[in-house]
C-alpha cells in the first residue's frame, strides 16, 4: 500500500486538528479543507490514478465532490469517476466566510455552479449540502446525525444508504458502492 502525506506548515505543525483546547474552531478550517481537497486531487492526477469510485468521509472532504464534478470533470482520472460521500454529525460551526467562497473558486468550480446546484453557502449545513449536491451516492455515517441532509439527498434523487448495523457495515457499504459504480438504481 502506498501512503502519501500532504501537509502545510500553517495548517498542521503548530496546532490541534480542528479547534483550540477550549473548543473554539479555527477560522480557517474550511480553507484548509479546500487546500487538502485540491492537494489530493492534484496528487491523483500526477500519479495518473484513475479511480472508479472516490469515497469522501466527513466534512473535511465536503468540497471534493464539488471539485470533481466541476473543475476536474474533464480530467482523465475523474471524467468517469463516481463520488460517494459519508455524512457524520460534526460540521464546522462558523458560517461561511467571504474568504471561503473566494478560495473555493477554481476553474469551473464557481459561485454560479454552486447557485445552479441550489446550495446556499450561508446556511450552517452548507458544506454537507455541497457534498450531497455533487455526489453520486450518500452514506449515513452516524445514525440520526444528518437527517436533514439525507432528506436533501433524497429530494435530489441521490441514492442513499442508511447506517447499517455494525456487523453488516462492510457488506452494505460494498453493495452500495458497487451499485453506484455500476450505475444501477439504489
Tell what function each PLM region has.
Residues 1-186:
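Catalytic cores of nucleotide-sugar-dependent glycosyltransferases that transfer UDP/GDP/TDP-activated
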